[in-house]
Curated annotation (Swiss-Prot):
Pfam families: Rieske, UCR_TM. The chain crosses the membrane at residues 111-133. Keywords: 2Fe-2S, Disulfide bond, Electron transport, Iron, Iron-sulfur, Membrane, Metal-binding, Mitochondrion, Mitochondrion inner membrane, Respiratory chain, Transit peptide, Translocase, Transmembrane, Transmembrane helix, Transport. It comes from the Eukaryota. Component of the ubiquinol-cytochrome c oxidoreductase, a multisubunit transmembrane complex that is part of the mitochondrial electron transport chain which drives oxidative phosphorylation. Residues 176-271 form the Rieske domain. One of its GO terms (molecular function) is oxidoreductase activity. Its main location: mitochondrion. This is Cytochrome b-c1 complex subunit Rieske, mitochondrial. Residues 25-46 are annotated as: Disordered. The Rieske protein is a high potential 2Fe-2S protein. GO terms for cellular component: mitochondrial inner membrane; mitochondrion; respiratory chain complex III.
């Protein structure tokens, strides 16, 4: 029986706070006087009940905790996590002892520091400008593409009344050497009756030579030279007729044949583009 009683006593002591155990023996261990009982009843912690089951059940209560109170045990006896739960504090306390403090700078060196920072920013801005310019210029046409943008044509081999076709920027270009009759016929047309009114002098730089892009203005077909009702070009796709000056005279095309940018380098040298 003494052995069983000792086990019960040790189990009840393991659930009591350390401070409560240090204050005195459990109730019933001895026969104290009446004054000691009243004093112990006032100072006895609330979790000094002998039953371990009852103490554990109180831990599930929303208003009670199995962690000892401040008056029962010191914070030094508890782990850091338990102390944080026991005394929550919304104020953030920074550890200033683990951070190195630097003394304030010398005011006489601030001008040099500002100069270095400003110079660095200027260098960074210049590098950024060069990168932006390089990126923008990389999207422009290269030299070989620009060389193909212009086309030089020798006109000495073209007979009067004939038309030659050259390729410029992926499009056909019609170059026609007109005769005197062709020039008179182009100038005799009533411009007011045309769908897209243009004088013949507005479409040529030299009346002998007519230079137009060989793409129909309707749906982009290639007209046939020396064909149609007006002796110019005829589009076989939808039946558009152009005269000797490349102006639309009949059919669904809304505009005249486009005149590219060109110039005469010499009497028999033509530069398209």
């Amino acid at each position: 029986m003494l052995r069983v009683a000792g086990r019960r006593l040790s189990s009840s002591l393991s659930w009591r706070p350390a401070a409560a155990v240090a204050r005195g023996p459990l109730a019933g261990a001895g026969v104290p006087d009446r004054d000691d009982d009243s004093a112990r009843g006032r100072s006895q912690p609330r979790f000094s009940i002998d039953s371990p089951f009852f103490v554990a059940s109180r831990g599930f209560s929303s208003t009670e905790t199995v962690v000892p109170r401040n008056q029962d045990a010191g914070l030094a006896d508890l782990p850091a996590t338990v102390a944080a739960v026991k005394n929550p504090n919304p104020k953030v306390v920074y550890d200033e002892y683990n951070h190195e403090r630097y003394p304030p700078g010398d005011p006489s060196k601030r001008a040099f520091a500002y100069f270095v920072l400003s110079g660095g920013r200027f260098i960074y801005a210049s590098l950024l400008r060069l990168l932006v310019l390089k990126f923008v210029l990389s999207m422009s046409a290269s030299k070989d593409v620009l060389a193909l943008a212009s086309l030089e044509v020798d006109l000495s081999s073209i007979e009067p009344g004939t038309t030659v076709t050259v390729k410029w920027r992926g499009k056909p270009v019609f170059i026609r050497r007109r005769t005197e009759d062709d020039i008179k016929l182009a100038n005799s047309v009533d411009v007011a009756s045309l769908r897209h009114p243009e004088q013949d002098a507005e479409r040529v730089k030299n009346p002998e030579w007519l230079v137009v892009i060989g793409v129909c203005t309707h749906l982009g077909c290639i007209p046939l030279p020396n064909a149609g009702d007006f002796g110019g070009w005829f589009c076989p796709c939808h039946g558009s007729h152009y005269d000797i000056s490349g102006r639309i005279r009949k059919g669904p095309a809304p505009f005249n044949l486009e005149v590219p940018t060109y110039s005469f380098l010499e009497e028999n040298k033509l530069l398209v583009g």
